[in-house]
Amino acid sequence: MNLSLENKVIIVSGGARGIGEGIVKTLLAEKAIPVVIDQRVSSIEGVKTIQADLTNPQACATAIENIAKEFGSIDGLVNNAGVNDGVNLANGNYQSFIDSLHKNLVHYYLLAHHALPYLKTSKGAIVNISSKTAETGQGGTSAYAAANGGRNALTREWAVELLQFGIRVNAVVVAECYTPMYQEWIQTQENPEEKLQSIQANIPLGKRFTTPEEIGQTVSFLLSEKSSHTTGQLIHVDGGYVHLDRAL
């Protein structure tokens, strides 16, 4: 694709591995300048990483400030960092629920809040990565599901609030995307290979997992002017997992 993203400075939270790394790779292929905010350092040569604990509000502010100082502009923000941490209704508690919201939702707001002055100047775009758990439920993950519901709601709210500045806001909703974190979860199952096969069998298109790069390609499109009249959308990149008949 030629999405005219060359030299555009795009922040990717949680960009050091998994879906975030897939997004970074596709942005690099488009000659953009992805900047990762993560506790880990990106293993991709030449990619700038700002190491930060995104559950710390001041760290969010400082990360944006440092990126703006170093690069001079911010052309896009991809809110991606988070973890399905299994805080459920039966065994969770107040603190674990609140902590999960900080890991999965609050920094979406804070990064966008601090990046907003720069995005107004560049008329940039925001893409929020979300999860099917907000729509389908999963069981055993109340806080993560709530956080993703919040991500979807913020996408629509920001799309309205930022219309006046020409800033577009969309979400990419992920279902079954095979990443290192997903592999770690599979290994906790009683029969990992059997569980993996059963999940794949329920993905309508191709009976396979979505790849991080496929998520990245849609994200790159939404960041680009090729999607200049698209805002407030929750776009499912999931092989039909959420909306198509599982009997297919």
Model-derived features with residue positions:
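Short C-terminal tail/terminal secondary-structure segment
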Residues: 1, 136, 220, 231-248
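Substrate-binding pocket helix/loop in short-chain dehydrogenase/reductase
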Residues: 88-101, 199-200
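Active-site loop immediately N-terminal to the catalytic Tyr-X3-Lys motif
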Residues: 90, 136-142, 164, 207, ...
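Active-site helix of classical SDR
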Residues: 112, 147, 155
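Alpha-helical segment proximal to the catalytic Tyr-Lys
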Residues: 117, 160-164, 228
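Residue(s) in the substrate-gating loop at a strand-loop-helix junction
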Residues: 131
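C-terminal helical subdomain
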Residues: 171, 179, 193-226, 230, ...
